[in-house]
Regions:
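Short hydrophobic alpha-helices and adjacent helix-cap/hinge residues
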Residues: 1-237
């Protein structure tokens, strides 16, 4: 049994073998990536634990509204090549959730650092704006640029993983990746006991964490509400 972490790794493994069982962890779109036939019935030699959770978009908006009550528009920045599920899964949910929160949804699909800068500059020029950064290899690769632009333009931004916040991002809400790794051995054991990956459903995330960088909040002039402080899993001073 092979454990594969991230979409690029699993894609490479998938090219090498269609027989050795593979259990993936932290893959955004296993169906779109061609790793499994469906979430319920993977159908091949690959199964595992995805980070996709469409309902998280509503939580993002809730957190941003708590942080910025005068919120009027929110942009989502993502790259469709590194997260095919973005357009298919996250964006429709984002647009619907925006209606509930009565904010204008803006979808920014980016493919280069220049496009990141342009999209964020346009957003920063609009009052009452905030930004959601979707997961994906592209946004991870360019996280330093995104974080620095958010700080320069004073855009309240929520990120998908803690490491964005460890590197200076304002706050993150996302899948607890360590929890996925803790759950993976169960599938490995079941496969070693004779179960087939084809019959083991792809598992969704169960545990999420909110991390807030208080130093960044002070630098940007944001007062973090007590309700967010109380609900945070970690506070970075």
């Amino acid at each position: 049994v092979i454990i594969g972490h991230s979409t690029p790794v699993v894609a490479a493994l998938h090219q090498v073998t269609q027989t050795i069982p593979i259990v993936f962890v932290v893959v955004g779109d296993p169906v779109g990536g061609g790793f499994v036939a469906s979430i319920a019935r993977p159908g091949g030699n690959i199964t595992g634990f995805t980070v996709v959770q469409p309902t998280i978009m509503g939580k993002y908006l809730s957190i941003l509204r708590e942080l910025k009550p005068q919120l009027s528009r929110v942009a989502v920045i993502y790259n469709d090549e590194s997260i095919p599920a973005g357009a298919a899964v996250y964006i429709p949910t984002f647009v619907e959730s925006a209606k509930e929160f009565q904010v204008i949804p803006i979808v920014a699909e980016v493919h280069s650092p220049t496009e990141i800068e342009t999209a964020m500059a346009d957003l920063g020029a609009m009052p009452g704006s905030a930004l959601i950064v979707l997961p994906g290899n592209f946004t991870t690769l360019h996280r330093e640029l995104i974080i620095s632009q958010a700080a320069r333009l004073r855009i309240p931004t929520i990120y998908p993983y803690r490491y964005f916040v460890d590197e200076g991002g304002l706050l993150s809400y996302g899948v607890d990746v360590l929890d996925l790794f803790r759950r993976a051995p169960d599938y490995v054991d079941r496969i070693l006991q004779g179960a087939k990956p084809a019959d083991l459903p792809v598992q969704a995330p169960r545990k999420f964490e909110l991390v807030i960088n208080l130093k960044t909040a002070r630098t940007l002039g944001f007062v973090v509400p007590r309700i967010l402080l109380a609900g945070a899993d970690a506070l970075i001073e």
